[in-house]
Structures are given as structure tokens and as C-alpha cells.
Amino acid sequence: MSAYIAPSQIAQRQLEYFNGKHVLVAGEVEDMFPLELTAHCESVEVFTSNYSYFRQIRHSDKIKSHFGSEFDVETQADMLLLYWPKAKAEAEYLLAMLMAKLGVNTEIVVVGENRSGVKSIEKMFKEYGPVNKYDSARRCSFYWGNCLNEPKPFNQEEWFKSYTVTLGEQSLTVKSLPGVFSHGEFDLGSRLLLETLPNLSGKVLDFGCGAGVLGAFMAKANPEIAIEMCDINAYAITSSQATLEANGLSGRVFASDIYSDTANDYRFIISNPPFHSGLDTNYNAAETLLGHAPQHLSNHGEMIIVANSFLKYPPIIENAFNNCETLNKTNKFSIYYAKKS
């Protein structure tokens, strides 16, 4: 079995496209195929919004790696290898940003699973130039194209979706970039969690902050707390910072791969964990979040989370804390509470 994800396997069948190129890899890349590319290319750079992947790839001395919501460094790339992202809006955002940066005569290779909507590249790339499918395998497609038209200048500010959410008497302006959980809406799980929260004090972590709805509401309702917000996704980090600024709030927003960059003395950990699909990988991440939480709480620190009720989180929480209460419940969501003894 290949160590590569299916889109990398189809790219691996077409290595001649990359010979002698300066390649920038972006999008939903999550394996070490860029390392193999270094044997065929003049240079390889990786731009990723996934902090976990960045932590893996940054240790390679053969590749320049960049983490962020915007690629704004000097580059000699003359080819973009785009792994098609899950959200179409994120694909549009990446194309607009990277084509503006790389410019006319940049070649593009797009790989992605057919079910992810990679076919959309055919229409989406029209404003830049021609693109055509050259290979299909493993339920994936391989496209090659060329940017012949001058791309429009890119301004990240224009890509934020701005919307207002109201809870009781409190209203909040939320700023959200494409690719962020619940982009443009206030999800029901977060609403239930906020309605259930007690008064907060001390240092509070909003884990998996998304566009910053939870953290901003908590900071607004409890002005004396020291709010910290973390996420694995660079678009979420930038969105949360923008949400805080839009509401005149302050807090520390940073990237973290679960607890890789967090403190260990939080009075509260509050989360709408981004693990709703029930996939094995998500359960592993959730088990780490819940199981290791006591190590990141101060004495008598408390954790309050919202989760889909079908997820078997209470035994994991009970195992970590020796206690677990259900504070609130609907037919879809449950609010779980645990205290470090």
C-alpha cells in the first residue's frame, strides 16, 4: 500500500510534468510527496494552512515550508501544484491569492478526489487561462493548465465574510475566511455551549476556535478573563484575530496541534471540538484533547465542551478526570463538564 494519499499517487504517475520546475505545493496536501518531488524539480516550496502538517514538513532541509492564511513571501515558483481543498470557497481563495502572487506564465497542476469537486477547476480557472484533465486514477483527477491572463491583485480583506450573531442581549460581529468551520453561520452546538456556560474567571482557553465566536463571546461577557484561542487551521487563526479586533476585544490567538503550543495552567478549557465526523483519526484527536486536558488545567480547573450526543466522549472524560457531568442536552448535542480534583 502506498504511503501517499490518492491525489499524490496520481501526481506520482505524472512526474515528467514537474521536471526542472520551481514548484509551490498548496492546498489539502498531507503527506511527504513534496519530498519525492525534490528529486525532479529545481526547487520545492510548501504553503499550508494546516499546522499539524507544517510541523511535520518544516523539518526537511530540502523544502522551504510556510504556514499561514496568506502566502506573502518572495518565491521563484513557476508552477503551482494545488491539492484540491474540501471547501470550494477555499479553492477560489487559494487560486486568487496564489495566481496573483505567481503571475502570468505560471503552470498549474491540480490533483484531487472526484468526490471533493475537483472538476470545478475547469470553470474556476477560466479567468486565468486554459486547464485540461490529463489523467484519472484512484477516483482522482489530474489537471494541467497555464496562467495566460494577468491575475487581479489579491486583498485578503475582501475575502472575509462578516456577519452578526446575537445571544441574549449580546451581539457580536464575526469575521470568517473561507475554509473555516461554520463559515458564515452561528452553529447550534456553539450556541448551546454559550447558553450553558457559568461565569468564567482567570485564564481561559477556547480550543479549536474557528472564527472566534466562543472566545469573543466569553471575553465580552467576562471582561476580566485572560482569553486564549487556538486552532490547527491558519484561516481560523486569522479569522479569530479579526473577530476580536472587530469587537474591540483582546486575547492571545495562536496555532496549536492539539496541545503542542498551549500552556498548562488554564482555569477553564472551553471547546466545541472540531471532531464531529466519527472517523478514527478524529476520535484519536478527540481522545488526546479530552484525555490530556487535566495536564493543561490549573488545580481545580474545569473543562466544558459541546459534542454530538452520539459520540462516546463521557467514558474518555471520566477516565481522565474521574468525573463527568452532562450540564445540558438537546436531541443532537450534549454539554459535558469535568473538574480537575
Curated annotation (Swiss-Prot):
Primary residence: cytoplasm
Catalysed reactions listed for this entry: guanosine(1207) in 16S rRNA + S-adenosyl-L-methionine = N(2)-methylguanosine(1207) in 16S rRNA + S-adenosyl-L-homocysteine + H(+)
Lineage, top ranks: Bacteria, Pseudomonadati, Pseudomonadota, Gammaproteobacteria, Vibrionales
EC number: 2.1.1.172
Family, per entry: Belongs to the methyltransferase superfamily. RsmC family.
Broad class of enzyme this protein falls into: transferase
NCBIfam families in the cross-refs: PRK09489.1
Gene name for this UniProt entry: rsmC
Subunit description: Monomer.
Name this protein carries in UniProt: Ribosomal RNA small subunit methyltransferase C
Subcellular location: Cytoplasm
UniProt keyword annotation of rRNA processing present: yes
Keywords annotated in UniProt: Cytoplasm, Methyltransferase, rRNA processing, S-adenosyl-L-methionine, Transferase
